[in-house]
Design a protein with these regions (language model features):
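Peripheral, non-AAA+ core regions of ATP-driven protein-machinery
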Residues: 1-217, 221-225
Length: 228
Protein backbone atom coordinates (compact mmCIF):
# COMPACT_ATOMS: atom_id res chain seq x y z
CA UNK A 1 0.00 0.00 0.00
CA UNK A 2 1.40 3.38 -1.01
CA UNK A 3 -1.87 5.33 -0.86
CA UNK A 4 -4.45 5.74 1.90
CA UNK A 5 -7.45 7.92 2.70
CA UNK A 6 -8.55 8.81 6.24
CA UNK A 7 -11.76 10.65 7.14
CA UNK A 8 -11.71 13.79 9.25
CA UNK A 9 -13.87 16.91 9.55
CA UNK A 10 -13.76 20.69 9.81
CA UNK A 11 -16.19 23.04 11.53
CA UNK A 12 -17.30 25.73 9.08
CA UNK A 13 -19.41 28.35 10.86
CA UNK A 14 -22.56 26.53 11.99
CA UNK A 15 -21.95 23.40 9.92
CA UNK A 16 -19.42 20.59 9.70
CA UNK A 17 -17.67 19.56 6.48
CA UNK A 18 -16.25 16.05 6.18
CA UNK A 19 -12.64 16.10 4.96
CA UNK A 20 -10.75 13.33 3.16
CA UNK A 21 -7.08 13.18 4.14
CA UNK A 22 -5.25 11.45 1.29
CA UNK A 23 -1.62 10.35 1.59
CA UNK A 24 0.58 9.03 -1.22
CA UNK A 25 4.09 7.65 -0.73
CA UNK A 26 6.12 7.12 -3.90
CA UNK A 27 9.66 7.05 -5.23
CA UNK A 28 11.16 10.43 -5.99
CA UNK A 29 12.95 13.34 -4.40
CA UNK A 30 12.49 12.95 -0.61
CA UNK A 31 9.92 15.47 0.58
CA UNK A 32 6.78 15.90 2.69
CA UNK A 33 4.39 18.20 0.85
CA UNK A 34 0.81 19.12 1.79
CA UNK A 35 -1.91 20.67 -0.38
CA UNK A 36 -5.63 21.47 -0.13
CA UNK A 37 -6.35 25.15 0.73
CA UNK A 38 -4.53 25.02 4.08
CA UNK A 39 -4.07 27.65 6.76
CA UNK A 40 -0.60 28.20 8.23
CA UNK A 41 -1.21 25.99 11.28
CA UNK A 42 -2.31 23.11 9.05
CA UNK A 43 0.75 23.51 6.83
CA UNK A 44 2.91 23.29 9.96
CA UNK A 45 1.43 19.84 10.62
CA UNK A 46 4.01 18.30 8.29
CA UNK A 47 6.79 19.08 10.77
CA UNK A 48 4.76 17.99 13.79
CA UNK A 49 3.73 14.74 12.13
CA UNK A 50 7.21 13.83 10.90
CA UNK A 51 8.75 14.44 14.31
CA UNK A 52 5.93 12.65 16.16
CA UNK A 53 6.26 9.58 13.94
CA UNK A 54 10.01 9.43 14.54
CA UNK A 55 9.63 9.87 18.31
CA UNK A 56 7.02 7.10 18.33
CA UNK A 57 9.60 4.57 17.14
CA UNK A 58 8.74 4.58 13.44
CA UNK A 59 10.75 5.83 10.48
CA UNK A 60 9.72 7.84 7.46
CA UNK A 61 11.33 6.49 4.27
CA UNK A 62 13.43 8.69 2.01
CA UNK A 63 10.54 9.00 -0.44
CA UNK A 64 8.15 11.55 -1.87
CA UNK A 65 5.18 11.98 0.49
CA UNK A 66 2.20 14.01 -0.72
CA UNK A 67 -0.78 14.74 1.54
CA UNK A 68 -4.00 16.23 0.14
CA UNK A 69 -6.92 17.48 2.22
CA UNK A 70 -10.05 17.37 0.09
CA UNK A 71 -12.25 19.03 -0.97
CA UNK A 72 -9.86 21.79 -1.99
CA UNK A 73 -12.65 24.39 -1.93
CA UNK A 74 -12.94 24.23 1.88
CA UNK A 75 -10.48 26.18 4.00
CA UNK A 76 -8.77 23.95 6.58
CA UNK A 77 -7.88 25.54 9.90
CA UNK A 78 -6.60 24.38 13.29
CA UNK A 79 -4.43 21.53 14.49
CA UNK A 80 -7.14 18.84 14.54
CA UNK A 81 -5.88 17.42 11.23
CA UNK A 82 -2.52 16.34 12.73
CA UNK A 83 -3.73 12.89 13.76
CA UNK A 84 -5.58 11.97 10.53
CA UNK A 85 -2.54 13.13 8.53
CA UNK A 86 -0.24 10.97 10.65
CA UNK A 87 -2.48 7.90 10.33
CA UNK A 88 -2.93 8.35 6.59
CA UNK A 89 0.85 8.50 6.10
CA UNK A 90 1.46 5.53 8.40
CA UNK A 91 -1.20 3.47 6.62
CA UNK A 92 0.34 4.35 3.25
CA UNK A 93 3.64 3.01 4.61
CA UNK A 94 1.96 -0.15 6.00
CA UNK A 95 2.62 0.69 9.65
CA UNK A 96 -1.13 0.38 10.29
CA UNK A 97 -3.72 -1.55 8.23
CA UNK A 98 -5.96 0.61 6.06
CA UNK A 99 -8.91 -1.69 6.84
CA UNK A 100 -8.77 -0.58 10.49
CA UNK A 101 -9.50 2.99 9.39
CA UNK A 102 -12.49 2.22 7.15
CA UNK A 103 -15.57 4.12 8.30
CA UNK A 104 -13.61 5.81 11.09
CA UNK A 105 -13.43 9.58 11.57
CA UNK A 106 -10.20 10.89 13.08
CA UNK A 107 -9.44 14.20 14.82
CA UNK A 108 -6.65 15.33 17.13
CA UNK A 109 -3.52 17.42 17.52
CA UNK A 110 -0.16 15.64 17.77
CA UNK A 111 2.78 16.90 19.82
CA UNK A 112 6.41 16.45 18.79
CA UNK A 113 6.81 13.56 21.23
CA UNK A 114 3.78 11.77 19.82
CA UNK A 115 1.19 12.67 22.44
CA UNK A 116 -2.35 13.36 21.22
CA UNK A 117 -3.77 16.65 22.45
CA UNK A 118 -7.35 17.81 22.77
CA UNK A 119 -9.07 19.95 20.13
CA UNK A 120 -12.23 22.05 19.90
CA UNK A 121 -15.44 21.31 18.01
CA UNK A 122 -15.54 17.62 18.92
CA UNK A 123 -19.29 17.32 19.58
CA UNK A 124 -20.55 18.62 16.20
CA UNK A 125 -17.83 16.67 14.39
CA UNK A 126 -18.81 13.38 16.05
CA UNK A 127 -22.49 14.08 15.33
CA UNK A 128 -21.78 14.73 11.65
CA UNK A 129 -19.51 11.68 11.42
CA UNK A 130 -22.37 9.53 12.70
CA UNK A 131 -24.80 11.14 10.25
CA UNK A 132 -22.39 10.40 7.39
CA UNK A 133 -22.29 6.70 8.27
CA UNK A 134 -19.06 6.48 10.27
CA UNK A 135 -19.07 3.62 12.77
CA UNK A 136 -16.32 4.96 15.03
CA UNK A 137 -14.37 8.10 15.86
CA UNK A 138 -10.77 8.29 17.04
CA UNK A 139 -10.27 11.39 19.16
CA UNK A 140 -7.99 12.71 21.94
CA UNK A 141 -8.49 11.23 25.38
CA UNK A 142 -9.06 14.78 26.66
CA UNK A 143 -12.21 14.98 24.50
CA UNK A 144 -13.60 11.55 25.40
CA UNK A 145 -16.48 12.78 27.60
CA UNK A 146 -17.61 15.24 24.94
CA UNK A 147 -17.46 12.58 22.24
CA UNK A 148 -19.50 10.10 24.27
CA UNK A 149 -22.42 12.51 24.43
CA UNK A 150 -23.28 11.17 20.97
CA UNK A 151 -24.86 7.73 21.04
CA UNK A 152 -24.72 5.19 18.23
CA UNK A 153 -21.05 5.66 17.31
CA UNK A 154 -18.02 3.99 18.90
CA UNK A 155 -15.60 6.40 20.57
CA UNK A 156 -11.92 5.43 20.59
CA UNK A 157 -9.93 7.79 22.86
CA UNK A 158 -6.17 7.90 22.36
CA UNK A 159 -3.41 9.62 24.30
CA UNK A 160 -0.36 8.88 22.15
CA UNK A 161 0.46 7.84 18.61
CA UNK A 162 2.48 4.73 19.45
CA UNK A 163 -0.31 3.13 21.50
CA UNK A 164 -2.90 4.06 18.89
CA UNK A 165 -0.89 2.33 16.15
CA UNK A 166 -0.56 -0.75 18.36
CA UNK A 167 -4.34 -0.79 18.84
CA UNK A 168 -5.01 -0.45 15.12
CA UNK A 169 -2.70 -3.42 14.58
CA UNK A 170 -4.84 -5.57 16.86
CA UNK A 171 -3.52 -4.92 20.38
CA UNK A 172 -6.78 -3.90 22.05
CA UNK A 173 -5.11 -3.59 25.46
CA UNK A 174 -3.31 -0.46 24.30
CA UNK A 175 -6.45 1.69 24.33
CA UNK A 176 -8.71 1.80 27.34
CA UNK A 177 -12.31 1.86 26.18
CA UNK A 178 -15.01 2.72 28.67
CA UNK A 179 -18.52 1.39 28.40
CA UNK A 180 -20.62 3.21 25.83
CA UNK A 181 -23.45 5.43 27.06
CA UNK A 182 -23.91 8.62 29.02
CA UNK A 183 -23.23 8.94 32.72
CA UNK A 184 -25.67 10.91 34.89
CA UNK A 185 -23.28 13.88 34.82
CA UNK A 186 -23.11 13.72 31.03
CA UNK A 187 -26.89 13.52 30.76
CA UNK A 188 -27.23 16.61 32.96
CA UNK A 189 -24.80 18.53 30.77
CA UNK A 190 -26.54 17.43 27.58
CA UNK A 191 -30.17 17.77 28.69
CA UNK A 192 -29.89 20.97 30.74
CA UNK A 193 -27.62 22.88 28.38
CA UNK A 194 -28.96 26.21 27.19
CA UNK A 195 -28.16 27.99 23.96
CA UNK A 196 -25.02 30.08 24.21
CA UNK A 197 -23.00 32.15 21.74
CA UNK A 198 -19.90 30.23 22.82
CA UNK A 199 -21.32 27.21 20.96
CA UNK A 200 -21.08 29.07 17.64
CA UNK A 201 -17.77 28.84 15.81
CA UNK A 202 -16.83 32.06 14.06
CA UNK A 203 -19.51 34.62 13.14
CA UNK A 204 -17.88 37.15 15.49
CA UNK A 205 -19.35 40.18 13.69
CA UNK A 206 -22.88 38.74 13.82
CA UNK A 207 -22.57 37.84 17.50
CA UNK A 208 -21.25 41.31 18.33
CA UNK A 209 -24.14 42.94 16.44
CA UNK A 210 -26.65 40.78 18.33
CA UNK A 211 -25.12 41.72 21.68
CA UNK A 212 -25.31 45.43 20.86
CA UNK A 213 -28.89 45.04 19.61
CA UNK A 214 -30.00 43.29 22.79
CA UNK A 215 -28.36 45.94 24.95
CA UNK A 216 -30.15 48.74 23.05
CA UNK A 217 -33.38 46.84 22.28
CA UNK A 218 -32.76 47.10 18.54
CA UNK A 219 -34.13 44.64 15.98
CA UNK A 220 -31.46 43.47 13.55
CA UNK A 221 -31.42 41.33 10.42
CA UNK A 222 -28.16 39.69 9.39
CA UNK A 223 -26.97 37.45 6.61
CA UNK A 224 -25.14 34.66 8.45
CA UNK A 225 -23.71 33.06 5.33
CA UNK A 226 -19.97 32.58 5.70
CA UNK A 227 -18.07 34.26 2.82
CA UNK A 228 -15.66 32.03 0.94
Amino acid sequence: MSFCTVLSAAVQGLSVEMIRVEADVSNGLPMFHMVGYLSSEVKEASERVRTAIRNSGMKLPAKKIIVNLAPATVRKRGASFDLPIALAVLAAMNYVPEEALKGVAVIGEVSLEGKIRGVSGVLPIVMEAKNQGCTACILPEENEIEGRLVSGIKILPADNLEKLCAYLNGDEKEIHRKKQGRSSAQRNIFENKKEDFSDICGQNAVKRAAEIAVADCIIVAADTQVPM
